[in-house]
């Protein structure tokens, strides 16, 4: 199985997650080609069994470069994809209140925005996940490798 992993890492967190995902999938005999979206042409993506798109969040949405990239992607309808994002972890407000997952979901729309673009092209999602970062520039939260491992386990492997 071959996975094409396209990320838009700004501060290196997404690239770190991509390397960990690639390592874990290699242990399962899966080939993962990792590249930054600046190194890829959205209308000329190499053939793969699965495309994995990864974006950091900016104001609760995928960064603009990833949104533009996804809008230009040309893949046949029915193509399988997955999403793995890097997003800010919940932090207490000035009153000390830490938002719940439900509250966070109201303003964090990275995966839904990416899905809307890709599903609008007839692509089929097979998995999605998030790795939280402690600050805007990172690093990832403690235990992030386990989150990547859990995500990798959710990818249906084809021979």
Task: Walk through the language-model features, giving the residues of each.
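N-terminal beta1-alpha1 ligand-phosphate binding loop
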Residues: 2-28
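Cofactor-binding loop segments of dinucleotide-utilizing enzymes, especially the Rossmann-like FAD-
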Residues: 8-10, 37, 84-86
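FMN-binding flavodoxin-like domain, especially the glycine-rich phosphate-binding loop
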Residues: 16, 24-28, 33, 47-159
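Short acidic active-site motifs
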Residues: 39-44
